[in-house]
Amino acid sequence: MKHLLSIADLSRDEIISLLDEADRFKEVLEGREVKKLPTLRGRTIFTLFYENSTRTRSSFETAGKWMSADVINISASSSSVKKGESLKDTGLTLSAIGADAIIMRHPSSGAAQQLAGYVAPGGVGPSVINAGDGSHQHPTQALLDALTLRQRLGGIEGRKIVIVGDILHSRVVRSNVDLLSTLGAEVILVAPPTLLPYGVENWPVRTSYDMDAEIRDADAVMMLRVQQERMQGGFFPSHREYATLYGMSKAREASLKDSAIIMHPGPMLRGMEINFGVADAPRTAVLQQVSNGVHVRMAVLFALVAGSDATI
């Protein structure tokens, strides 16, 4: 595996291998006062973010540093991108400096694929990891969600996973649909008609407008943020009406079966798609998702950068 651009690029065995590797990293680091491994010593990793990020960026940086890599952060707002430099020239510059991997977030779908073509023609050059490209893909988020589901539910195959919210603009849901269906889960997407994408009937999912009917027997409910920054308005009448129909209220949380968990990729809009108290409930796995993100990203960096003869 040279790059990680999309969940669709991974086989079922590769997905399971990455999840197993993430579990191994968690086990090795657990209880250590100094969380440091020599695995990527001497390697140089760049994070290149054209959009804001808290969890993904800091998680990748932590993963690299815990593996002793040199991690260099670049924000588009403070780089030559502000002067009009193209994605191609930015990527080639980082490659010339000596990047072993470039982790990129970009507002345009397909940008990660473009960057990989620029910096590693013929497979020679730095690895590219897609940290989110437009509404297209966010593969490491889907991997950390799968790891969380596996840990909390004991497995994914045959489980009913309900994803609620802004399906239209979500790269997270597209990656999760690919991954969860590959691992044998039943995936149901719940949203108002205006927030379901064209062609969703061809996805390996079932769709519904009725949140209450779908969540009662769900094993996990994943809430999505309404991405207002990608909207011009008119997708739903008001925030209050949206929260009433598609928010995880205390009453809805109480209607879930005892073993069900609630997830959210973040950032959460408390009071809109999830109630303030529910966000902190014991069955809510948000912080476990964040913690798992570091171990999943360690596993991805290990697979792409460490080399075939490397050991943890």
From Swiss-Prot:
Entries under PROSITE patterns matching the protein: CARBAMOYLTRANSFERASE (PS00097)
Disulphides: none
PANTHER family: ASPARTATE CARBAMOYLTRANSFERASE, ORNITHINE CARBAMOYLTRANSFERASE, MITOCHONDRIAL
Organism of origin: Corynebacterium efficiens (strain DSM 44549 / YS-314 / AJ 12310 / JCM 11189 / NBRC 100395)
Purpose: Catalyzes the condensation of carbamoyl phosphate and aspartate to form carbamoyl aspartate and inorganic phosphate, the committed step in the de novo pyrimidine nucleotide biosynthesis pathway.
Binding residues for L-aspartate: K83, R171, R225
EC number, as in UniProt: 2.1.3.2
Sites where the protein binds carbamoyl phosphate: R55, T56, R105, H138, Q141, G266, P267
Protein name, entry field: Aspartate carbamoyltransferase catalytic subunit
Broadest EC class assigned to this enzyme: transferase
Gene for this chain: pyrB
InterPro entries: Asp/Orn_carbamoyltranf_P-bd, Asp/Orn_carbamoylTrfase, Asp/Orn_carbamoylTrfase_sf, Asp_carbamoyltransf, Asp_carbamoyltransf_Asp/Orn-bd
SUPFAM superfamilies recorded: Aspartate/ornithine carbamoyltransferase (SSF53671)
Keywords annotated in UniProt: Pyrimidine biosynthesis, Transferase
GO BP, sorted A to Z: 'de novo' pyrimidine nucleobase biosynthetic process; 'de novo' UMP biosynthetic process; amino acid metabolic process
Entry's transmembrane regions: none
Keyword Transferase applies: yes
Top-level division of the source organism's lineage: Bacteria
Family: Belongs to the aspartate/ornithine carbamoyltransferase superfamily. ATCase family.
Any GO MF annotation of the entry: amino acid binding
Cellular compartments per GO CC: cytosol
Complex formation: Heterododecamer (2C3:3R2) of six catalytic PyrB chains organized as two trimers (C3), and six regulatory PyrI chains organized as three dimers (R2).
Pfam families: OTCace, OTCace_N
Reaction(s) this enzyme catalyzes, per UniProt: carbamoyl phosphate + L-aspartate = N-carbamoyl-L-aspartate + phosphate + H(+)
Pathway: Pyrimidine metabolism; UMP biosynthesis via de novo pathway; (S)-dihydroorotate from bicarbonate: step 2/3
